[in-house]
């Protein structure tokens, strides 16, 4: 049995909140760099250059890449042989509170969805814990802005809709979103499970690096086909047209009921943020 203190969790989460908001993951940065080289439309290239300049300035000045520093989505892979000394969830919330305060990150969370009073410290975080074997503890902080989150969709397709219905829903989601999610976008796509699980799968898909395809060749091929179809829409960077509408997408799947075909698309902007640490 291994013991991890609540203080260590707090310190780690605070650091990851700042890191995620000021540094793009290497895979997303590489995809943006590649798009700058390959985009054939001049206006689209100019737009990508501006996004790159903003990214570089944030890195140089250690400032947030985007003014929307997001809702702190925290994912934990926790070993079953780990004992947390202190309150686990309270430690995560305190880490978010400290990270957003010390990093001068915008406070964007309201305590109640209808009464709308701001909590003033960007808590509470949205916490997801996945139990795994062993004594490990891996924490990922993925701040999620809501310009793109609001463009996300879920649909309970009929089994008869099949793969073509699945693909159409994904592409139509991007069409409907247009320029609203600050393209070029990144998509997390979930398929299968139940109403609640498929939304989780879509969010989980955003955690997979863009250069890592689905391990199932069938879904890896679907990822390529969908990316090509989306980039033929002509929405382009910030909606100004061009070939670069989507930097990449990932599909996560799970078994489902014989009568269902749940699909969820979690839309993310070109500032798709995540930072991880092993404790």
Regions found by a protein language model. Give the residues of each.
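Non-transmembrane, aqueous-exposed alpha-helical and coiled segments at domain scale
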Residues: 1-189, 194-279
